[in-house]
């Protein structure tokens, strides 16, 4: 049994990186759908492409809408449906897409310049957050804004707990604020870092909560006890993006350091390091395989790459 488990683990030195070419401009956001059959990427050129994971070639991509819809700040797939995703636009619009449709299936006009979006585990709710730290909570079934909530401090990435009764928000105070959902009653602050907290991610097995900060540290927490189990301190620049592998065994992180760090979640030790030619914008593990998509800011390229093929 132990041998079969070992054999199933990736042999990192043998894994290759592939450039996905054809999309113009640096990649701003990317993500895999529920099944891992598609990878969506948005770029500074205004294009949103959906890549076929079985045929990772530009000629097999599908463009959602057209660039007349504006610049996508963030996109996120419905966690319960492989064809649906949500995107927040620089022009204060929030759009819901179905991959099979040429036009948005719903549009919501927001009063705020939203820059981040997340979806609840049940797929029933979404949240969009703005440059002005305004949170817009959306009923994804009726596709309407339920409530807006003004944060009194800088707010960056946010997410729901697996049970969907709590909502977590990273802040510029070095804390993660926790509110009850849907009452939005503030119940606890995690004193996570000495400076701004930028990113947050639960592991798929719900045994780890990762928080990335401006102090170049990634902290790993027990989400039940809210106790810090270990810190990863290898990087020199603020942590901007985090992603757990599907089996919760590995944590990928990225910053302005010119590499992707892949850590063992049980020890925090570096398992592998992927060199890059520029700062990292986003990392995203495939939902069922040890394949990592990541976006790098590099000249004359979108910087979209796949590791693990």
Curated annotation (Swiss-Prot):
SMART domains: WD40
Domain of life of the native organism: Eukaryota
Subunit structure comment from the entry: Component of the transcription/export (TREX) complex, which is at least is formed of SUB2, TEX1 and YRA1 and the THO complex composed of HPR1, MFT1, THO2 and THP1.
Protein name, as recorded: THO complex subunit Tho3
General function of this protein: Component of the TREX complex, which operates in coupling transcription elongation to mRNA export.
Lineage, top ranks: Eukaryota, Fungi, Dikarya, Ascomycota, Taphrinomycotina
Family, per entry: Belongs to the THOC3 family.
Chief subcellular location: nucleus
Subcellular location: Nucleus
Keywords recorded for this protein, A-Z: Nucleus, Repeat, WD repeat
GO annotation (BP), single: poly(A)+ mRNA export from nucleus
WD repeats by residue range: 22-61, 65-107, 109-148, 192-231, 234-273, 275-309
GO cellular component annotations of the record: THO complex part of transcription export complex
Alphabetical list of InterPro entries matching this protein: Tex1/THOC3 (IPR040132), WD40/YVTN_repeat-like_dom_sf (IPR015943), WD40_repeat_dom_sf (IPR036322), WD40_rpt (IPR001680)
Pfam families the UniProt entry points to: Beta-prop_THOC3 (PF25174)
PANTHER family linked to this entry: THO COMPLEX SUBUNIT 3 (PTHR22839:SF0), THO COMPLEX SUBUNIT 3 THO3 (PTHR22839)
SUPFAM superfamilies: WD40 repeat-like
Gene3D superfamilies found in the cross-reference section: YVTN repeat-like/Quinoprotein amine dehydrogenase
């Amino acid at each position: 049994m132990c041998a079969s488990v070992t054999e199933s683990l990736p042999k990192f030195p043998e894994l290759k990186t592939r450039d996905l070419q054809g999309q113009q401009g640096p990649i701003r956001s990317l993500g895999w759908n529920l099944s891992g059959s598609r990878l969506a990427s948005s770029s500074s050129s205004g294009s949103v492409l959906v890549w076929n994971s079985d045929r990772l070639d530009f000629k097999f991509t599908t463009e959602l809408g057209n660039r007349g819809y504006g610049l996508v700040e963030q996109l996120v797939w419905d966690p319960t449906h492989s064809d649906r995703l949500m995107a927040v636009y620089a022009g204060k619009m929030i759009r819901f897409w179905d991959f099979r449709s040429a036009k948005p299936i719903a549009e919501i006009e927001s009063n705020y310049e939203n820059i981040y979006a997340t979806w609840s585990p049940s797929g029933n709710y979404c949240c969009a957050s703005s440059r002005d730290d305004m949170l817009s909570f959306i009923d994804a079934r009726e596709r309407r804004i339920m409530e807006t909530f003004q944060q009194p401090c800088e707010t960056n990435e946010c997410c729901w707990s697996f049970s969907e009764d709590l909502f977590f928000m990273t802040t510029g105070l070095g804390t993660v604020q926790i509110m009850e959902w849907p009452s939005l009653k503030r119940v606890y602050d995690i004193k996570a870092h000495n400076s701004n907290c930028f990113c947050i991610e639960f592991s798929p097995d719900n045994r780890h909560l990762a928080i990335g900060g401006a102090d170049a540290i990634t902290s790993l927490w027990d989400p039940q006890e809210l106790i810090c189990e270990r810190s990863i301190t290898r990087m020199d620049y603020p942590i901007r993006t985090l992603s757990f592998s599907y089996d919760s065994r590995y944590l990928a992180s990225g910053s302005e350091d010119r590499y992707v760090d892949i850590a063992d979640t049980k020890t925090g030790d570096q398992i592998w390091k992927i060199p890059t030619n520029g700062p990292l914008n986003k990392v995203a593990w495939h939902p069922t395989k040890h394949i990592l998509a990541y976006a790098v800011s590099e000249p004359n390229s979108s910087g979209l790459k796949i590791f693990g093929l």
